[in-house]
Every structure is written in structure tokens, then in C-alpha cells.
């Protein structure tokens, strides 16, 4: 079994691909992989580090305004297709999957034109430009949100969920809580703003820290390494309550997510896949700085089902943060209802579901 994977630029496109590869390796240790990305994307360091053969092509995304850069992009696309065809013929894959980001455009397009089974995986509720373009040529389009399906040819759409969801399952939540200093007997909320943190969330948290000290639940706050020193400087002045733990970063996020009762976070596709797979209630603060405002639309998909509350960044203050947390953590019935709603949305076997679709394509 030979599988070619392409996707990159951001972690949101790369980590689902790696989760899928790990799942396939568990089931088929003999499977061979080739990953095609760009040299300037995150994938050029993450993928080789994971022990997966990596090749690069030169490609860039379209600018939304008419510009000379777009002419160069078209030329790079044509060259990218030629280079991709060369790699594809050499590797001879049974199936090709693109997980988003402009790099997978020429790769998946080239594979489709060579008659190789192809599939794209769309993580967000609003598809990216590349996946919308590729949906005309591929055999299948795998989605994680029902809202994404309407943007693609219906005959090609399959709901698989995000392979990252599979990687947070079967973790030891008690071990996770202990590792960060949380009590096993108290309710707890985890607050974080993504891998690099988020200043508006930091500001609201710092403003609320004294009031958190009066609560009968515990708070674990992940600042992001960039913001840690600044946050701690303010916290030292205000005082750090015993029930509030502050960390720059944690390496065992799946364990900690499993252990806590409530999560406050951005609304990236990977985060939502993990939260729903675990049945975790959440307060989502979508980043307003992303393409097509897709985080707000991601959040709406699970807020509408009762699994989360949404707090827009423009409305985020110490008061609104505290109010939303109290409303869920201090009401056992609300907490329970949201847990059930999240669990019903989760697709914990997403990696296997996606692989099943790929296997069907290989048989054709």
C-alpha cells in the first residue's frame, strides 16, 4: 500500500495528515508514504521529524486582489503540477490525499489528471480556496462539519470528522490533572488561546484573576510561551490564588483535556474535533483574524447543537469570561447537557473512517 499525502502551511492542515498516517501505520505497518509540501511551510520541519519521507515543490497562494503576484502564482502552479507528476510517477501511489493549504493544489490536481484515486479532507466549516478548486477533480471530499458539505458536489461528500480526534481518546485524565497541579476532587476549567496564546484572552484572564480566587473550582491557564513572562509579571503584582495554575505550555494536552470539566479556547477545527470526541463542554472565543471568519462559523456549528457557548472577542472582558464559566461550571445540569451534546457531535474514530473511504477508492 502506497499513499501520497499533501497539505501544509499551518498546523491545522498538517496534524490531521500525520494523525491519519499514524492510524494507517498501526493497521498496516508495511504501508509506504510520501508527503509533498513546501520548503517554507511548517510541514518541512514537522513531517521529516515524524520520520515520513518528504519532497517539496515551489508554490504560493493567490492574492485576493488582482496583482502581478497572481501571474507568478499561475506559473508556479503549472511548474508545481509538472514537478508533482514527476514525484507521483516515481512513487506510484495507490491513492493521493490532500489535507488543505495551497501546496496540495498542484499535487492533487496532477494525481487526478494521471487517473490516480484522489480525496481531499476539509477541516473547517468554510472550505479553503484550494479544496473548493480541487473538489471538481477529486473522487471524494471528506468533511468535518455539516456546514462544509454545501460548498462541494453532493455526490462526492463524505462525513469523516478530523483524524486528530482519534489521538485524544483513551487518555488518563486523572494523570493529566495531577501533572499540572489540579485537584482530583474539584471541578476545573482549562483556558488557552492556541499554541502561541492570544493576547485578548490573556488580558481578560489577568483582569479576572482575583475573582477566580473566590471560586470553588480550579483554573488552569495556558498563556502561550510568548506571553508567559508578561502575564506572570502582572500576576505577581495582583497575587496568584491557590486555585489558579498558570503554565506557558503543556506537552500532554490530550491527557489534560480528558481530565478537565470545561474548556475555554479559540475555535480552530482541530480543537473542536478533540473537544467533541471527548464530550467536553466549551466556551469558544473565535479568532477574528482568520480567513473567511471560519472560526466563528466552526463555533456556530457546535453552539447550535448545545455543545458550546460562543463569546466573541469584541465582547470579551473579565466579567463576560467569569459569567460564562460560572453559568456552566456552577450548574450541574447545564454541564451535563453540554457534555452529552458534545459527545453526540464527536467522531472519535475519524482517522479510521477517513482511511475506510481511501480503501474504497483504492479498490476501484
From Swiss-Prot:
Superkingdom as given in the UniProt entry: Bacteria
Main location: membrane
HAMAP family: MurG
InterPro entries: GlcNAc_MurG, Glyco_trans_28_C, GlycoTrans_28_N
Biological process terms in GO annotation: carbohydrate metabolic process; cell division; cell wall organization; lipid glycosylation; peptidoglycan biosynthetic process; regulation of cell shape
Designated name of the protein: UDP-N-acetylglucosamine--N-acetylmuramyl-(pentapeptide) pyrophosphoryl-undecaprenol N-acetylglucosamine transferase
Species this chain originates from: Bacillus cytotoxicus (strain DSM 22905 / CIP 110041 / 391-98 / NVH 391-98)
GO cellular component annotations of the record: plasma membrane
Gene from which the chain derives: murG
PANTHER family: GLYCOSYLTRANSFERASE, UDP-N-ACETYLGLUCOSAMINE--N-ACETYLMURAMYL-(PENTAPEPTIDE) PYROPHOSPHORYL-UNDECAPRENOL N-ACETYLGLUCOSAMINE TRANSFERASE 1
SUPFAM superfamilies, per database record: UDP-Glycosyltransferase/glycogen phosphorylase
Reaction(s) this enzyme catalyzes, per UniProt: di-trans,octa-cis-undecaprenyl diphospho-N-acetyl-alpha-D-muramoyl-L-alanyl-D-glutamyl-meso-2,6-diaminopimeloyl-D-alanyl-D-alanine + UDP-N-acetyl-alpha-D-glucosamine = di-trans,octa-cis-undecaprenyl diphospho-[N-acetyl-alpha-D-glucosaminyl-(1->4)]-N-acetyl-alpha-D-muramoyl-L-alanyl-D-glutamyl-meso-2,6-diaminopimeloyl-D-alanyl-D-alanine + UDP + H(+)
GO molecular function, one term: UDP-N-acetyl-D-glucosamine:N-acetylmuramoyl-L-alanyl-D-glutamyl-meso-2,6-diaminopimelyl-D-alanyl-D-alanine-diphosphoundecaprenol 4-beta-N-acetylglucosaminlytransferase activity
Keywords: Cell cycle, Cell division, Cell membrane, Cell shape, Cell wall biogenesis/degradation, Glycosyltransferase, Membrane, Peptidoglycan synthesis, Transferase
EC code(s) of this entry: 2.4.1.227
Listed pathway(s): Cell wall biogenesis; peptidoglycan biosynthesis
Subcellular location: Cell membrane
Binding site for UDP-N-acetyl-alpha-D-glucosamine: 10-12, 124, 195, 250, 295
Task of the protein: Cell wall formation. Catalyzes the transfer of a GlcNAc subunit on undecaprenyl-pyrophosphoryl-MurNAc-pentapeptide (lipid intermediate I) to form undecaprenyl-pyrophosphoryl-MurNAc-(pentapeptide)GlcNAc (lipid intermediate II).
Segment forming the signal sequence: none
Record keyword Transmembrane helix present: no
Pfam families to which the protein is assigned, alphabetical: Glyco_tran_28_C (PF04101), Glyco_transf_28 (PF03033)
KW Chloroplast (keyword) present: no
Membrane topology classification: Peripheral membrane protein
Top-rank EC class of the record's enzyme: transferase
Protein family per UniProt: Belongs to the glycosyltransferase 28 family. MurG subfamily.
Amino acid at each position: 500500500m502506497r499513499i501520497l499525502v499533501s497539505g501544509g502551511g499551518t498546523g491545522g492542515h498538517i496534524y490531521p495528515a500525520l494523525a491519519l498516517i499514524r492510524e494507517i501505520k498501526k493497521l498496516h505497518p508495511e504501508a509506504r508514504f510520501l508527503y509533498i509540501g513546501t520548503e517554507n511551510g511548517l510541514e518541512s520541519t514537522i513531517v521529516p521529524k515524524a520520520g515520513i519521507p518528504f519532497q517539496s515543490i515551489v508554490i504560493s497562494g493567490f492574492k485576493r486582489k488582482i496583482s502581478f503576484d497572481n501571474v507568478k502564482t499561475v506559473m508556479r502552479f503549472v511548474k508545481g503540477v509538472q514537478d508533482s507528476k514527476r514525484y507521483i510517477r516515481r512513487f506510484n501511489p495507490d491513492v493521493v490525499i490532500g489535507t488543505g493549504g495551497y501546496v496540495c493544489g498542484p499535487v492533487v490536481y496532477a494525481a487526478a489528471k494521471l487517473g490516480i484515486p484522489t480525496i481531499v479532507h476539509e477541516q473547517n466549516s468554510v472550505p479553503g480556496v484550494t479544496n473548493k478548486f480541487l473538489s471538481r477533480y477529486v473522487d471524494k471530499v471528506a468533511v468535518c462539519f455539516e456546514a462544509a458539505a454545501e460548498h462541494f458536489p453532493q455526490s462526492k461528500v463524505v462525513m469523516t470528522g478530523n483524524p486528530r480526534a482519534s489521538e485524544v481518546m483513551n487518555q488518563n485524565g486523572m494523570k493529566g490533572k495531577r501533572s499540572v497541579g489540579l485537584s482530583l476532587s474539584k471541578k476545573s476549567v482549562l483556558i488557552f488561546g492556541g499554541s502561541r496564546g492570544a493576547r485578548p484572552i490573556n488580558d481578560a484572564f489577568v483582569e479576572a484573576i482575583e475573582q477566580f480566587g473566590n471560586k470553588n473550582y480550579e483554573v488552569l491557564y495556558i498563556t502561550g510561551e510568548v506571553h508567559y513572562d508578561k502575564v506572570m509579571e502582572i500576576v505577581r503584582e495582583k497575587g496568584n490564588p491557590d486555585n489558579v495554575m498558570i503554565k506557558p505550555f503543556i506537552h500532554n494536552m490530550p491527557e489534560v483535556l480528558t481530565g478537565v470539566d470545561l474548556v475555554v479556547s479559540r475555535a480552530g477545527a482541530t480543537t473542536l474535533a478533540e473537544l467533541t470526541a471527548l464530550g467536553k463542554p466549551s466556551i469558544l472565543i473565535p479568532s477574528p483574524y482568520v480567513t473567511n471568519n471560519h472560526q466563528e462559523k466552526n463555533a456556530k456549528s457546535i453552539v447550535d447543537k448545545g455543545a458550546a457557548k460562543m463569546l466573541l472577542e469584541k465582547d470579551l472582558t473579565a466579567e463576560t469570561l467569569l459569567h460564562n464559566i460560572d453559568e456552566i461550571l456552577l450548574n450541574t445540569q447545564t454541564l451535563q447537557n453540554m457534555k452529552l451534546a458534545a459527545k453526540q457531535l464527536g467522531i472519535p474514530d475519524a482517522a479510521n473512517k477517513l482511511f475506510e473511504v481511501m480503501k474504497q477508492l483504492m479498490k476501484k
